């Protein structure tokens, strides 16, 4: 921020609320994608910054620096799109889908999705890896079994984000513990206080949702037709699962995400050359670029196996660029710091401090769309207040995870939200009501802050 320019708290609140009104009204009243509303917010905030005396060079630098911070998420999203195309063509996702359709009852699908994604995400410590592997296959199963896709997406995301929050392998778990300067397992143990109640409520809710899914003869016949359609059109072989297995093993070894995804793409290409009889280099590269185009008379099967490719992620890539531009601009003109400074002045109790931490993490998520900033900025800002009031920092780190890690997938322009929507083919606004774990945890965190002394 320019040293001679400083926004006041009321002005920062006004600008922030006005931007949210633009975005929310466009999303819910006009039913448009979030790209242009975010772009309008960038234009509005740039004009306001010029009005308040910020030079254009400073505004431009904030926008450019923000986009620079989004380069890694953009690369990851692009690689995941390519990987899904590779796994579709090689047969990895069709094989997982066929096996799952053969053994999972439709009424049990939601709980199966929840617990299987919990296990994988805890092992690998990454919601993105979990969703791009088993999550995509489970969406295919739901499509064939007649289970609402938004319900299944909710279960997949709840399970995937459980590991993002609780796994010692997770980047965000280690990052939050590092911000609070506390041991990782002390941080994880303390998070049990909000995680276990939220998980139990989530399990109960998905149980009742799953119980409402019928498994009649027509549904069974439809599933068999989908299985036949997939087998006739795509490659179904257990050998294709070696590539997802490699990705999971590398993630468990804590190899960085970009090499992991690249290894998945390369290994899939090798397996395709060996085990896919109809393969050609041209067709494989086309699948990596544009996704698969298998021909089948079964419409449900076609929707499951014709997906992926680099181009499928371009909408999310452009969304993240605009969101990071907005976040960089807000940070450059001091809007975020002005909001946090104003919030901190009104804190008088432990409950208010915990609530302010959670809400600030949510606010930074909304402002920047970036998970790490939603942990870093409130964490650094509130750390001294926890020390001053003799409140253990594990309350800080838990609040950062509940408001930072878990909320990002609920924001259409957030990195995780944009990825989840693209990978699963379900808009964020559609799956939000069913991501119970993600919004129950912050509520419990705030409640405990006021109740537990």
Swiss-Prot record:
Activity regulation note: The antiport activity is markedly inhibited by both valinomycin and CCCP, and modestly by nigericin.
UniProt keyword RNA-binding, yes or no: no
Pfam families tied to this protein: Na_H_antiporter
Subcellular location as annotated: Cell membrane
Keyword check for S-adenosyl-L-methionine: no
Sequence intervals crossing the membrane: 9-29, 36-56, 71-91, 109-129, 137-157, 193-215, 257-277, 320-340, 353-375, 429-451
Main location: membrane
Gene Ontology annotations for the cellular component aspect, listed alphabetically: plasma membrane
NCBIfam families: antiport_nhaC
Function: Is a secondary, electrogenic Na(+)/H(+) antiporter that catalyzes Na(+) uptake and proton efflux. Makes modest contributions to pH homeostasis in the alkaline range of pH but is not contributor to Na(+) resistance. Appears to have a repressive effect on growth and on alkaline phosphatases production in the presence of sodium, by affecting the transcription of the phoP/phoR two-component regulatory system.
Protein name per UniProt: Na(+)/H(+) antiporter NhaC
Source organism: Bacillus subtilis (strain 168)
Protein encoded by which gene: nhaC
């Amino acid at each position: 921020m320019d040293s001679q320019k400083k926004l006041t708290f009321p002005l920062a609140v006004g600008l922030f609320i006005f931007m949210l009104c633009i975005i929310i009204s466009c999303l819910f009243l006009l039913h448009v994608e979030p790209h242009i509303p975010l772009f309008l917010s960038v234009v509005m905030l740039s004009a306001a910054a010029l009005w308040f005396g910020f030079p254009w060079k400073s505004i431009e630098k904030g926008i450019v620096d923000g986009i620079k911070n989004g380069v890694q998420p953009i690369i990851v999203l692009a690689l995941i799109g390519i990987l899904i195309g590779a796994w579709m063509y090689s047969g990895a996702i069709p094989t997982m889908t066929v096996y799952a359709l053969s053994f999972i009852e439709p009424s049990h699908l939601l709980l199966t999705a929840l617990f299987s994604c919990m296990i994988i995400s805890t092992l690998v410590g990454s919601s993105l890896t979990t969703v791009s592997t088993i999550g995509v296959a489970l969406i295919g199963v739901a499509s064939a079994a007649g289970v609402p896709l938004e319900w299944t997406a909710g279960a997949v995301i709840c399970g995937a984000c459980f590991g993002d929050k609780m796994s010692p392998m997770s980047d965000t778990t280690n990052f939050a513990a590092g911000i609070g300067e506390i041991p990782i397992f002390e941080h994880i143990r303390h998070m049990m206080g909000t995680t276990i109640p939220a998980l139990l409520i989530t399990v109960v809710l998905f149980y009742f949702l799953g119980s409402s899914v019928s498994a009649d003869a027509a549904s069974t016949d439809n599933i068999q037709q989908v299985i036949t359609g997939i087998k006739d059109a795509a490659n179904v072989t257990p050998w294709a699962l070696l590539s997802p297995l490699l990705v999971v093993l590398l993630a468990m070894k804590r190899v960085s995400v970009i090499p992991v995804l690249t290894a998945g793409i390369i290994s899939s290409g090798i397996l395709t050359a060996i085990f896919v009889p109809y393969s050609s280099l041209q067709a494989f590269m086309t699948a990596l670029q544009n996704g698969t185009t298998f021909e089948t008379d079964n419409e449900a099967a076609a929707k499951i196996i014709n997906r992926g490719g680099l181009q499928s992620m371009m909408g999310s890539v452009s969304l993240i660029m605009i969101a990071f531009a907005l976040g960089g601009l807000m940070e450059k003109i001091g809007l975020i710091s002005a909001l946090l400074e104003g919030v901190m002045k009104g804190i008088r109790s432990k409950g208010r401090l915990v609530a302010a931490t959670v809400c600030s993490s949510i606010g930074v998520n909304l402002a920047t769309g970036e998970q790490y900033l939603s942990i870093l900025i409130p964490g650094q800002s509130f750390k001294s207040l926890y020390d001053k009031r003799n409140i253990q920092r594990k309350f800080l780190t838990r609040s950062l995870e509940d408001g930072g890690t878990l909320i990002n997938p609920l924001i259409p322009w957030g990195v995780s939200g944009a990825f989840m929507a693209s990978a699963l083919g379900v808009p964020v606004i559609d799956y939000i009501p069913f991501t119970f774990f993600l919004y129950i945890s912050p509520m419990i965190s705030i409640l405990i802050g006021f109740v537990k002394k």
